[in-house]
Amino acid sequence: MQKRKLGFAGPHVPIICLGGNVYGWTLSEAETFRQLDMALDAGLNFVDTADVYSRWVPGNKGGESEAIIGKWFAKTGKRKDVILATKVGNEMGEGKAGLKRAYIRQAVEDSLRRLQTEYIDLYQAHKDDIETPLEETLGAFDELVKEGKVRYIGASNYSGARLSEALETSCKHNLASYISLQPHYNLVERQDYESDLLPVVKKYQLGVIPYFSLAAGFLTGKIAANRTRKRPSEERWCKST
């Protein structure tokens, strides 16, 4: 599979990233294992998850996706074959959210335990936390990089202005810097990324890992725009065309 460098200083990764938000949701543990096996056999070894996946499923508490991936690592012994990305900062319940130093320190240990690994290749801020100074957040990430628990850091769901401010903060204080951005971007919804984020991505040479890149399946053709009955999640894409 074709690979390219992730951002200005990241690892070389496949041009496709395998998202794990359905693990523990629409895919069972056994189905997830089969998917991961098939992906690696095809050369797709870039896997992205988050601590919050799949907390929204009734009966789940969060961390299910990470835990299933961790079990797969334990079963196959293929941790070193995978470029592993996960995220921190989204709502996990009981006050567990945000990007304060203390919470990042707690959350990374929880993720490492669930993933059954000693390090995370790409640790991403899942969304901006305007209540926490950027220097505090980036300082916490910098500590994790220096300790070897995290190799690279990235951002997701930031505005262009805040992303630029974060990158300048890292430069000013000599802290670990975001090498990648995970934005909502596809051929249906382009405006926010192209007008606000793309200039920052180009200026700082960030890698981009878009989510909803197929518009939740709409761009595959599986959802007909004129279909009489649509799931609520499908309505948004059909109205955008």
Named regions from a protein language model:
Residues 11-16, 43-45, 78-82, 116-121, ...:
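Short, well-ordered coil/turn segments that N-cap beta-strands
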Residues 6, 18, 32, 47, ...:
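Conserved, mostly hydrophobic/aromatic
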Residues 31, 62-68, 101, 105, ...:
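Charged helix-capping and loop-helix junction motifs
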Residues 19-30, 91-105, 127-132:
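Active-site mouth loops of central-metabolism enzymes
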Residues 27-40, 98-115, 163-168:
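Short, acidic/polar
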Residues 52-53, 75-99:
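Structural motif corresponding to the early beta-alpha repeats
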Residues 128, 132-241:
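Beta/alpha (TIM)-barrel catalytic core signal, keyed to glycine-rich beta->alpha loops juxtaposed to Asp/Glu
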Residues 1-81, 146:
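N-terminal binding-site loop/beta-alpha segment at the start of enzyme catalytic domains
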